[in-house]
Regions:
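Short, flexible helix-loop junctions that flank or precede catalytic/ligand sites
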Residues: 1-251
Length: 251
């Protein structure tokens, strides 16, 4: 689904432009990286380390700046990855989930119920972004094109992660943060791919999270959800401007 290639591209960007100590733990290693501005050490599960969690714990003793964990498969790996991020490391990893809200719920759900409240608070403070991807067949038959959901952890989304009853609001917050934060939902991405002529209407309907809303957008009709999101985006902008103004006063 493009996860490995996307991670490799992100890692190459860091390697090209920043002086960092990078350690990767992968299963298997699919892209070989050479040192550029950064130094990079790649380790393969089954060859260099026994499992993701053990490799992750071992690399923390080597003072890495950036850690790539090929996949967070179990509680031990997720718990160690959260600890690594909490102690100042940039941690990049993947999950087999559909979108940002499901990724957040997956991370939290692997912990025992009596620990989940603390994990929510921890995750809300360290998570920086979630990128989700669906590969949609191109209309011209030349392979597939990625529909991409991007969630940036804004103060409001931090609040939604920390409070269980607000997690369901994350998707709407992503949709409302297009112009201000550069976020987008799958449905917004798929609609843009359709408008740009990359995918057919049928594929747009098939891969959309809310196919009825996609159909209404194509017909030029605003759904009640679209109207609500526009109002939400305006409200978020007002709050952001207010917070910036208050910060300026304090300075």
């Amino acid at each position: 689904s493009g996860k490995t290639t996307t991670l490799a591209a992100m890692l190459d960007h860091v390697n090209t432009f920043r002086r960092e100590n990078i350690i990767t733990i992968e299963d298997p290693i699919e892209y070989l990286h050479k040192d550029k501005k950064s130094t990079i050490s790649q380790r393969e599960v089954g060859m260099d380390v026994q499992m993701f969690s053990r490799g992750l714990r071992a690399c923390l003793r080597e003072d890495p700046d950036v850690i790539l964990v090929g996949e967070m498969r179990d509680l031990d790996t997720i718990e160690t990855a959260l600890l690594a991020a909490e102690t100042g490391h940039l941690v990049l990893s993947t999950l087999h989930t559909l979108d940002a809200p499901e990724s957040i719920n997956r991370i939290i759900s692997v912990f025992a119920p009596h620990h989940q409240r603390q994990v929510r608070l921890q995750l809300s403070s360290i998570l920086r972004a979630i990128i989700s991807m669906r590969l949609v067949p191109r209309m011209d038959g030349q392979g597939r094109v990625p529909a991409v959901e991007v969630m940036i952890t804004t103060p409001y989304i931090q609040e939604c992660i920390a409070e269980k009853e607000k997690t369901g609001l994350i998707r709407d917050a992503i949709a409302a943060g297009v112009s201000q934060y550069g976020m987008q939902t799958f449905d917004q991405s798929i609609y843009q791919l359709y408008r740009d002529g990359y995918i057919s209407f049928e594929q747009g309907m098939k891969y959309s999270t809310n196919s009825e809303a996609f159909k209404l957008r194509v017909m030029g009709i605003q759904s009640t959800l679209d109207i609500a999101l526009e109002e939400m985006e305006k409200s978020m902008s007002k709050v952001e401007r207010f917070e910036e103004g208050e910060g300026a006063k304090e300075e």
